[in-house]
Amino acid sequence: MEEKAGLRHLQNQQNEPSQDPHQCADPCPALHSDRNHLNKEAEAMEGQNPTCSRHESAYPIQSQVSKSKKQRNYVDGAAVDDLKNLWDRLQTLQQSLTEMPYAEGLKPLKNFTSFEELLSMGGDSLLNDLLDIQDSITQCCIRASKYLNKEGNCTSLNYYKQPFIAAVYGPTGCGKSQLLRNLMSAQLIVPTPETVFFITPQVDMIPPQEIAAWETQICEGNFLAGPENTVVPQSGSIMPRFIQMSYAQLTKDENYDVTSPNNIFANAASKGPIAIVMDECMEDLGGNRGIAKFFHAFPSKLLDRFPKCTGYSVIVVLHNMNPRRDQGGNIANLKIQAKVHMISPKVHPSQLNRFINIYTKGQPTAISLLLKDIFNYHRLNTNFDWIVYNTEPIDNCMHWMYLSPQEGLIPMYLNIQGKLYQALERIHRTLTDRQRWTRYYHSKKK
């Protein structure tokens, strides 16, 4: 009958799917049913048994968590400009590293032949990393610009940080005395001192011409140009005082006690900021009598006791960066407490290299060699320029600075040079990996 009625079984027809053991015997309506069609079967929510028997779906109900995408999957116009700016800086740095005399033991870094080759062959991963480095450099420049004037020069050495302890290193004839006066007249030490104590081994060592130069330049540094051809004093004193003292007077016991009425420094600090300048005193500093308290203990007591004393500065001149005689430990303590080291390029290269090796341990070797090359260039081509190292700069761009009578105090941005060298290493690593995989591919083809 079935054959006659055309109800023949189809060949190769699959059997009915077996009942799911987890399925309820009686169908139950879905949690959200159609109110107009109550009997209409709807898909159940996750966790419910379906109302009809069907194969389990091969796809999960929950969508897979999408993977994080790259920051940039294409290079737009602004990114191309950033990369071009970075590329120009990289070319300048790589050329400087290649041409400097200290580059003999430096590892050469591979690079693209042109900016167009970098864009076409660099790849998304490399270009994104370079853009991140460029963004970091831009942020560093923005943060540093807050402390610079319109010409890009630093406006101060200490930016009101107290106490200000500085060491000046340089041989005879490199302009140390002129530098000390320029620090006062250019207002690179803030606040401006109202009293300057000039310490020498003997008082009669200073010629009258130098005394007149000191008095003139500290007076010049006490004023700024105001409106309508007026001048504005920068301290509470119209005429700052210049006091000469011998090293023996400095080391009197009464001058260590801030409560003593005969303490000459306390009397001056009760009226305003003070500065102590020690010149030609290296032999006395190497003696047995210690004066290290002038570098750490004495300033804190003086600043706490006299509110008008908003600034305490000590500047010590040394002819040798590593003197053999330091019986009292004064020079060693000075180097530890000094926040600023002002170095003449005329200092012996062996002493310079030792100082650079100690204070550039966080920088790549190439940047340390670049700094040595900068010192060497100014040693051969300039006379009265200085390189300044700040242990506690207000911004990382100002760890190393360059002081010129013509250009002023300029940051050297060695931290940015380190980031640029990091970008060169990133390019070198990419090209090296590609060459290694190319060699591996050709070796397998053989």
Curated annotation (Swiss-Prot):
Keyword check for DNA repair: no
InterPro entries listed in its UniProt record: Adeno_IVa2, P-loop_NTPase
Compositionally biased intervals (Basic and acidic residues): 32-43
Entry keyword set: Activator, ATP-binding, DNA-binding, Host nucleus, Nucleotide-binding, Phosphoprotein, Transcription, Transcription regulation, Viral genome packaging, Viral release from host cell, Virion
Induction details: Expressed in the intermediate phase of the viral replicative cycle.
GO biological process: DNA-templated transcription; nuclear capsid assembly; regulation of DNA-templated transcription; viral DNA genome packaging via site-specific sequence recognition; viral release from host cell; viral transcription
Residues where ATP binds: G170, P171, T172, G173, C174, G175, K176, S177
An annotated Gene Ontology molecular function: DNA binding
Localization annotation: Virion; Host nucleus, Host nucleoplasm; Host nucleus, Host nucleolus
GO annotations of cellular component type: host cell nucleolus; host cell nucleoplasm; virion component
Region (DNA-binding): 439-446
Transmembrane intervals: none
Location of region: Disordered: 1-72
Family recorded in the similarity comment: Belongs to the adenoviridae packaging protein 1 family.
UniProt function note: Component of the packaging machinery which encapsidates the viral DNA into preformed capsids and transcriptional activator of the viral major late promoter (MLP). Binds, along with packaging proteins 2 and 3, to the specific packaging sequence on the left end of viral genomic DNA and displays ATPase activity thereby providing the power stroke of the packaging machinery. The activity of packaging protein IVa2 is stimulated by protein 33K which acts as a terminase. May be the protein that pumps DNA into the capsid powered by ATP hydrolysis.
Self-association state and partner proteins as the record states: Homodimer. Part of a genome packaging complex composed of packaging proteins 1, 2 and 3; this complex specifically binds to the packaging sequence on the left end of viral genomic DNA and performs packaging of the viral genome. Interacts with protein 33K.
Descriptive protein name: Packaging protein 1
Organism of provenance: Canine adenovirus serotype 1 (strain CLL)
